[in-house]
């Protein structure tokens, strides 16, 4: 814990500390996405043990990543939702679906001539969320251990679902804004607005 006066306190763990490999977060990766299985709610807690010759863990020392704004879909073609702006972020989705339904959400920066998701430019980055419903009815998913670079999101499921609410949480580096710009030229203003979305890189630049 770092305090405002520059001092700090270390709160260490002891033999009473326990951990678990269970829980709904089954997989998470910076480039490939996250798997959340809400059926996995039971946690088996086990005593921890110290591993030899491991690297020292330190807290992140750069600018924090924070929510900048939320985008709603501006269009939908097939099962592809268009958020109108290429950005770094993660979806928050509420669905009405049966228990055990597997929902797959792929993210991309482009669509093809038929309006379907185009992901060849992402190379090996999968940018995919796999969400498994833990009960019947309304449930919300909000991945917290990955982020995507995208404008379009393709949603599919192995059972019929209803998307109740869908929005994209735009993520950005927590940099202090020191000025603003506006003008009557639409193209120039759009260029300026796009700059605000460049504080976190998108998949091709990662």
Located regions from the model:
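Extracellular/oxidizing-compartment recognition motifs
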Residues: 1-206
């Amino acid at each position: 814990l770092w305090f405002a006066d520059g001092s700090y306190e270390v709160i260490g763990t002891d033999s009473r500390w326990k951990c678990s490999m269970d829980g709904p977060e089954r997989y998470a990766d910076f480039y490939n996405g996250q798997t959340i299985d809400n059926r996995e709610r039971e946690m088996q807690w086990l005593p921890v043990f110290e591993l030899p010759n491991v690297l020292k863990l330190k807290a992140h020392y750069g600018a924090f990543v924070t929510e900048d704004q939320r985008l709603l879909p501006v269009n939908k073609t097939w099962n592809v939702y268009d958020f109108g702006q290429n950005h770094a972020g993660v979806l928050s989705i509420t669905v009405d679906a049966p228990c055990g339904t597997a929902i797959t959400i792929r993210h991309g920066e482009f669509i093809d001539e038929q309006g379907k998701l185009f992901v060849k430019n992402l190379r090996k980055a999968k940018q995919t969320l796999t969400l498994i419903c833990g009960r019947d009815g309304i449930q919300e998913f909000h991945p917290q251990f990955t982020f995507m670079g995208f404008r379009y999101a393709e949603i599919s499921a192995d059972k019929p679902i209803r998307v109740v609410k869908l929005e994209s949480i735009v993520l950005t580096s927590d940099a202090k804004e020191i000025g603003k710009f506006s003008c009557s030229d639409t193209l120039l203003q759009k260029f300026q607005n796009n700059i605000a979305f460049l504080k976190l890189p998108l998949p091709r630049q990662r």
